[in-house]
Amino acid sequence: MTGKKPKRTAEDRLPGDPTRDVLVEGMIRVDHAGEFGAVRIYEGQLAVLRGGPAEATIREMAEQERRHLDGFDRLISERRVRPTALSPLWHAAGFALGAGTALIGPKAAMACTEAVEEVIDEHYAAQAEKLGEDEKELRDMIEDYRRDEVAHRDLAREEGAAEAPGYELLTGAVKAGSRLAIWLSTRI
């Protein structure tokens, strides 16, 4: 057979890089934390915007994030991965971010969604690239969820995210916070 050998997770790792198991556990941990945070952001937004014109859009995105969280809950349990120790922080911070941006207005809530989902799109793409055929289930899950996150980002843009007061500052801060949360939740 002259066919190319299927890619395996962490096959090209260098000395000092995480082992395959550590890499995959970190991915599951951070993705579980991220989906938990996303659910909390939408809960915060809904607490403020319930009954308004943005409610149906936010509720639909929240339901998809809940499905993502359920998927990572299953993996955390099946693979016996330790969840992040920062869950209490993400519980409060996610709700506060959602409610805080919603208090500015529906466009700011959409700007928050756009910023978070843009970072998650990049994050999930990088993860999928690292996963080989031996982690096809996880890779497929991440790619499926990534499509939803991109759709959320695009919907937030359609709903006027760029019209939010202080759009550049707001989205820059949310992106920086999202990247920090990813870095911390992978490790802690």
PLM feature spans:
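Non-heme di-metal
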Residues: 1-188
